[in-house]
Amino acid sequence: MLNEVKGKLIISCQALPDEPLHSPFIMGRMALAATMAGASGIRAQGMADILEIKQNTKLPIIGIVKRNYDDSEIYITPTKKEVDELLAVGVEMIALDATNRPRPNGEKIEDLVAYIKSKGVETMADCSTIEECYEAE
């Protein structure tokens, strides 16, 4: 997937429950509009939205799940549970928070990345510093 999108536009099609555009139907239409506008990939949140987006475009999808945990500030694909949800809907790439903060349940980013790669799926690191980028690499 990386070669397909490198140097090209990836459009994020996401809306959370408290946002006005929250709806799998709307996200599917946003992804269709992104496709028509020349996007090379879609970044999407949650199983329902991703399944709807797949009905509207053949573009590769970078999947995330945003979920809060009491024992961690990590919010973007924080645990194996969210990774498994994304694997179940067949995304081409999974993005994870790769900041230097503790993950929920004591999980480790290295273990999640190894697990994702063992399933043949690419990973993307969401980082907040140059140092985190080097570590994620």
Where are these regions (language model features)?
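N-terminal amphipathic alpha-helix/helix-capping segment at the start of soluble metabolic enzymes
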Residues: M1-L21
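Hydrophobic faces of well-ordered beta-strands that scaffold small-molecule active sites
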Residues: G7-C13, I42, I61-V65, I94-L96, ...
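Active-site-adjacent beta->alpha loops and helix N-cap segments on the catalytic face
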Residues: P20-P24, R43-I62, E73-K80, A98-I116, ...
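A short, N-terminal amphipathic alpha-helix
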Residues: L32-G38
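Conserved, mostly hydrophobic/aromatic
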Residues: A34, I53, L86, A136
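Short, structured coil segments at secondary-structure junctions
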Residues: T57, V89-G90, K119
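Short, acidic/turn-prone active-site loops that include or flank metal/cofactor-
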Residues: K66-D70
